[in-house]
């Protein structure tokens, strides 16, 4: 959590660090947080939307689900990556879930109450320290940014990737998407590299 009237931006994790974190959390029997981090980096949804996910959505036979985004009220269809599907099923089995309509990220504090965003941010900061993650500002937003950065870096056509991400993130321009992913700052800093002495 940031101080009132201050501005702190979250950073993205390197993809290998993010997927390794998901595996380590699972290995350490922290199944729900492993699943939460995994869903964040594989779906690119805002945390408010991740917290709406039910087991029925994640275990869908056609490996996709539709969600109405809380912030924009827009419907978004999400396809579940084949490799990530196995992790979802493993978490489902390990947690011994009995009700498919149950939210995936129940806090245990009251019936049908999901984790709070503040609590998740505290947990992420603890994970940063515990697993020695190389990231300055680690928050729920970092998961979405990690997704975006991976999509951008994996694409052979950077401009097309930015247009796709702009639509997925519901940004009004590619410029906003570039700034969101920290690409604009990198471009500006790279300006200094073109100088010679």
Regions found by a protein language model. Give the residues of each.
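DNA breakage-rejoining catalytic core of tyrosine-based enzymes
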Residues: 1-19, 73-82, 98-101
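Active-site/catalytic core of tyrosine-dependent DNA strand-transfer enzymes
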Residues: 15-18, 83-134
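Short, basic, alpha-helical segments at the C-terminal edge of helix-turn-helix-like DNA-binding modules
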Residues: 146, 193-197
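Catalytic-site neighborhood detector that most strongly recognizes the C-terminal catalytic loop/helix
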Residues: 69-73, 169-194
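Short basic/aromatic active-site micro-motif
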Residues: 134-154
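Basic, Lys/Arg- and aromatic-enriched nucleic-acid-binding interface segment
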Residues: 2, 15-43, 157-158
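Conserved tyrosine-mediated DNA breakage-rejoining catalytic core shared by Y-recombinases
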Residues: 52-84
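Active-site-proximal segment of tyrosine recombinases
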Residues: 49-51, 148, 156-170
């Amino acid at each position: 959590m940031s101080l009132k009237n201050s501005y702190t931006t979250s950073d993205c994790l390197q993809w290998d660090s993010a997927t390794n974190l998901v595996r380590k959390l699972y290995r350490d029997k922290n199944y729900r947080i492993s699943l939460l981090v995994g869903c964040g980096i594989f779906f690119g949804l805002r945390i408010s939307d991740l917290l709406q996910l039910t087991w029925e959505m994640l275990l869908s036979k056609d490996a996709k689900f539709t969600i109405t985004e809380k912030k924009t009220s827009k419907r978004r269809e999400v396809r579940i990556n084949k490799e990530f599907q196995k992790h979802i099923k493993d978490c489902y089995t390990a947690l011994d879930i009995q009700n498919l309509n149950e939210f995936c990220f129940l806090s245990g504090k009251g019936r049908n109450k999901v984790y709070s965003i503040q609590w998740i941010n505290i947990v992420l900061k603890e994970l940063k320290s515990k697993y020695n993650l190389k990231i300055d500002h680690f928050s729920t937003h970092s998961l979405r940014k990690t997704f975006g950065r991976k999509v951008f870096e994996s694409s052979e056509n950077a401009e097309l990737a930015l247009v796709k991400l702009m639509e997925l993130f519901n940004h009004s321009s590619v410029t906003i998407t570039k700034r969101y992913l920290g690409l604009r700052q990198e471009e500006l800093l790279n300006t200094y590299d073109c100088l010679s002495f």
